Amino acid sequence: MSVSKKPMVLVILDGYGYREEQQDNAILNAKTPVMDALWAKRPHTLIDASGLEVGLPDRQMGNSEVGHVNLGAGRIVYQDLTRLDVEIKERTFFANPVLTNAVDQAKNAGKAVHIMGLLSAGGVHSHEDHIMAMVELAAERGAEKIYLHAFLDGRDTPPRSAEASLKKFEDKFAALGKGRVASIVGRYYAMDRDNRWDRVEKAYDLMTLAQGEFQADTAVAGLQAAYARDENDEFVKATVIRAEGQADAAMEDGDTLIFMNFRADRAREITRAFVNADFDGFARKKVVNLNFVMLTEYAADIKTAVAYPPASLANTFGEWMAKNDKTQLRISETEKYAHVTFFFNGGVEEPFAGEERILINSPKVATYDLQPEMSSAELTEKLVAAIESGKYDTIICNYPNGDMVGHTGVMEAAIKAVEALDNCIEQVTKAVESVGGQLLITADHGNAEQMRDPATGQAHTAHTNLPVPLIYVGEKNVKAVEGGKLSDIAPTMLSLMGMEIPQEMTGKPLFIVE
């Protein structure tokens, strides 16, 4: 008979943040003798679950998807926007080999560097700060002919807000003494995603042929003329920017073209028009042999250089368990099942070898304030049985209540949800201790600890950017480390299990065995 395993259990209390003020705090207003006792008597610490510490922009509230990716990855997983912000701030962007090679190639051949993208501070498809950094990179590396083809936003920004952005770039080029804005066009044309090729063709001709419906001496003048025609930013018609005596910025063979959008869906069509030999969306009047760079991978089947390929997450916690022949269980209700499986595994859908999954159906109610305990009793019953079975080396469980009931904004219901969880934690703790296992209790982000918005007085239904608790229950004598974050959890579990931590995990163990 096989030896019974003593499992390492991770319980994620979704939306269970830490806030010391009792006002509007469902967690502190609930009766939680079990969690209170654990916090008082067991090794514990607070960890960050929002902002830069989980790869989001500074001070942005955490969310369940990002939280579970970080929990399972054992490293901060940056979103593209934040990844680029960090790269630019730390100046690694300016040494990106794909970008520098593309610029150097054009410069050394006396060719132009064309930069295109959505000139916007919206941060959804692109960010103008990234485009500015690209202009600086090209200038610093000695490129003389730098042409910016600006797609105008007005969807993720106010409808008429492009003027300040265009002026900023015209001032920049003036200060550099080289380069210019060569064209402007609304995203309606340049960033279609529904195969409306007649629109894309107008943007393509504007850039390749330097031909448009309109022409202006400066980008700001071109924009003002569009406003006079009653075109908002998004719908600005193809406008060539060229003052008297300026060389035309049509694209030529051997030029470099760098597309600075980081979001793929609206970047694919125009990229295919430039890159695909067998392109048939429209008959191209001019096919240019360009050195084309995508900022991120817009599609796996677009064969051209990528400055920032997708970060594949090697050796996440789940994969590392499988490589070490360990058994693991993932268990949650419907609402958070994807989070303890797909997201915790770094975006991998298929279970790893030795990974089992249990899905408990969430109750069929209109809103969860009507049943704040949700399916926690059944979930706990199955979880306790799994702990006592001796089958699993590790178990990952998510209780959705704090988040799903927190989102309703109903304080009384959120209090009931937290009280139901306390009862569950009591049973789980007893089960873990009875088999000599170890338990970590934490959260992926806050929610239930702030049920009213102090600024508006309205119900607060969103997540928070507050820290979350981390508690250790087990037989080991451990000391807690301060200053942790979600990406420290996987290394913490491995260290408590006495396992090696893979080098890809840059997080640090938060409980040190004394």
From Swiss-Prot:
The alphabetized UniProt keywords are: Glycolysis, Isomerase, Manganese, Metal-binding
The record's Gene Ontology cellular component field reads: cytosol
Q: How is the cofactor bound?
A: Binds 2 manganese ions per subunit.
Query: Which BP terms from GO are recorded?
Result: carbohydrate metabolic process; glucose catabolic process; glycolytic process
Q: Which SUPFAM superfamilies match?
A: 2,3-Bisphosphoglycerate-independent phosphoglycerate mutase, substrate-binding domain, Alkaline phosphatase-like
- Could you say which residues bind substrate here? 125, 155-156, 187, 193, 263-266, 336
What EC designation does it have?
5.4.2.12
UniProt cross-references to InterPro entries, sorted A to Z: Alkaline_phosphatase_core_sf, BPG-indep_PGM_N, Metalloenzyme, PGAM_B_sf, Pgm_bpd_ind
Q: What does the entry list as the binding residues for Mn(2+) 2?
A: 14, 64, 444-445
> Would I find Manganese among this entry's keywords?
yes
Q: Please write the reaction equations for the catalytic activity of this protein.
A: (2R)-2-phosphoglycerate = (2R)-3-phosphoglycerate
> What molecular functions are annotated in GO for this chain?
manganese ion binding; phosphoglycerate mutase activity
Q: Which cofactor does it need?
A: Mn(2+)
Tell me the enzyme class.
Answer: isomerase
Q: A Pfam family for this UniProt protein?
A: Metalloenzyme
Recorded hits in CDD domains, A to Z, give: iPGM
The active site consists of 64 (phosphoserine intermediate)
Give the residue range of the signal peptide.
none
Name its pathway.
Carbohydrate degradation; glycolysis; pyruvate from D-glyceraldehyde 3-phosphate: step 3/5
Subunit record text: Monomer.
Task: Give a short account of what the protein does.
Answer: Catalyzes the interconversion of 2-phosphoglycerate and 3-phosphoglycerate.
Tell me which family the UniProt entry assigns to this protein.
Belongs to the BPG-independent phosphoglycerate mutase family.
Q: What is this protein called?
A: 2,3-bisphosphoglycerate-independent phosphoglycerate mutase
Q: Which gene encodes it?
A: gpmI
